[in-house]
Structure formats: structure tokens, C-alpha cells
């Protein structure tokens, strides 16, 4: 049964989606090798916001990605990767040596975990084209013209002040132009401190409609922080329904502009086996998804697949329980796909997982 979706601002026509961030070169030693022992690396591309644009494009959403990459073979190859997956890249900037002197594409190294050994990421993103380009030159009124939904994350502003100022400007402009805004805090301890992330991301909340994750934010006053036991920074790591409902309500009381909050909860059994479920606050109620247990081929991008799954479900006016279950199923499927992004192009495969249908498709 269809219902009026408050997130779509009364517009149930096909939506145009845009996201902004850094697309990176990903280098991974093959066969679960450790980086210090590797003699070769597999090359691919990724990045949180790019992953979401790509996942939505593969599911048929009109999806655009904006970034700055160097005008060289690496930058052009990253753009080609996006375009080959139906992501519109027209607004992307291929910078010159004069505009970005280091002329670098951001890079990260992934050491894939196995069994009890966790995966490890090493970033090499300083002086990348996105961080060096003068982002004040970007005309956001022109960039956002014709779009309905903007997605941002807390990763890009962690890169430097240039990016942090730009993302705040994006948030303000998007709200002025009436776009739906989603935001994922996506804390990365290797890029900035918890305190820096919390101060910045809390500034973003008044502009957000759909929030992914519940950290890092100034959620509690010092005298009411309930952290204890398996809680960290005022957030329960593996919450009960009642705990999560209380946390969500605390967000809504402070930020009534939020129309939806969603977080996934991971249970780590080993480096190669996890369980996953999610909670979502929507239209005054907290919903809890099914719990999935699965083996992992590639964990990177699981959170991005969750976000893209929920955005897709919202854009297609799913019922609340179907929205959160579709999001979790999208994330679970991503764990079975090598690379950063969820390249699933068959919505029925995600729905089948929602219904626990594992039959061979012929």
C-alpha cells in the first residue's frame, strides 16, 4: 500500500540524486596478503560518496557525482569507472597542474582481514586534487540546479579546512534550494580526532533530513551522558530496541528537522563472519530490521550500501519495515561483492534476500 512520503517533499516523480566527495584509487594485496609482505596490488576505485552514487545508478536512479580529480590518466580512469556504472559525471572537475599543484588522486591501501585478523586501511590522501582545488570557485546554485536529493558524509570535511568549509556551504545551499539532504557522519579516526568530528558534524545536523548513523555528535549534556558498559561516547554499541528508541527520540527532540534516522548494528564473530541488523526512526516510530548472519568477501562499503539501499527504498516509497529491511539486505549483499561499491543491478535479488530466498535464478 502506497503512502505519502514526507521525505520527498510532496514530490513523488522520479528524483534526481547528487552526492559530493572524493573518489580514490584503492590498492589491495591479493589473497589476503599483509601489506608489508605484498609484491603486487590489485587496483580499483572507491570512496564513500562515490560508492553510493554508483549503487543507486546501478539500481536505475538518476545519479550524479561531483568531485575534483587530476587531469591525468588516473583521474580520467576514475571518471571512466563511474561512467561505466551509469553515474553522471558532467559537473566533475579535471584539474590542471596550476589549480592543484600536487596533481594527485587520493589513494588508500586495504589489507583484507581473514578469520580473527581484521582488515586494515592506510590512507594516502594529503594534497589530493580535491583538497588543493579552490572550492570557493564552485557555483553551488548552478551545481544543485534541477536536483532533488543531496547526500554528504563526514569523511570529506575531515580532509582539510577547504573541504570542511565547502561541505557546510553545500548543506546551507541545498536547504535554501529545497533539496532533501542525507548525511552520514562516517567517523574516520585516521583523518581527524573524535572531538573535531563531533564539533563539526553537530553543526551539520540542522540542515539534514535523513541521518545515517548516530555518531559523532554532541548528543548528551555532560551531566546526562549515559555511557556505561558496552556504551561508547553516549551510544550503545549493540543496543536493545528500547535503548535505540530512546537515543532516536533524543535526536528528534533536539533536531525536529530530522525526518528519518537509521543506523546499522554489526556483530563481529570473526574477520570473515558477521551479523547485521538495523534500527530506523521514521514518522514517529522506531523500526528494527531482521538479523542477517553471513560470510564476508569484502566488508568495505557495507555502510555505503546500507545508505544507498535506504535512499533507494525512500525514493520508491517503500513502507517503513520494507525500507529498513531493504537497506540491510543491500548491505549484506555488498559484503559478498569484491570492491568498494555495491554493483547489484537487480532489485529482485535484494528483495529475495529480504525474504530469505536463496534459490538459483535461471
What is each model feature region?
Residues 191-283:
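Conserved phosphate/ATP/ADP-binding segment of small-molecule kinases
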Residues 2-92, 113-116, 133-136, 288-290, ...:
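Glycine-rich phosphate/adenosyl-contacting loop at the front of the ribokinase-like
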Residues 173-180, 255-259:
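A short helix->loop->beta-strand "cap" motif at the edges of active sites that frequently abuts
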Residues 62, 66-154, 181, 350-362:
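Conserved N-terminal subdomain of the carbohydrate kinase-like
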Residues 271, 290-356, 360:
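Conserved post-catalytic alpha-helical subdomain immediately downstream of the catalytic base
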Residues 181-183, 211:
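Hydrophobic faces of well-ordered beta-strands that scaffold small-molecule active sites
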Residues 166-178, 200-207:
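Catalytic-core regions built around general acid/base machinery
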Residues 126, 155, 186-190, 216, ...:
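Active-site beta-loop-alpha junctions enriched in small/polar residues
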